[in-house]
Design a protein with these regions (language model features):
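Long, contiguous binding/interaction regions
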Residues: 1-51, 55-81
Length: 81
């Protein structure tokens, strides 16, 4: 993979307790959210879960690994793609 590039980070969790804010705060510690594409959120049919796609300006594989590691370790994150 070539860097820098815009890269989508997909995260899923329960639709409560400002999950979106939590995910953004973790990602923004490591990267800049791409302003044009930004954030796309989708709530499940029953409203219990939310999936977020956050497009970031990725500078390196190490940066992506750090983002995935921190998000995956958080108890409120159920799944990542």
């Amino acid at each position: 993979m070539d860097f820098p590039r815009v890269f989508p980070v997909k995260v899923m969790g329960a639709n409560k307790d400002d999950f979106e804010g939590l995910v953004l705060s973790i990602i923004q510690k490591h990267a800049v959210v791409a302003a044009k594409e930004g954030l796309v959120s989708r709530v499940s049919r029953n409203g219990r879960f939310i999936s977020l796609t956050v497009r970031i300006n990725a500078e390196s594989q190490e940066q992506l690994d750090n983002i995935y590691r921190e998000l995956s370790a958080h108890e409120k994150v159920l799944m990542m793609l």
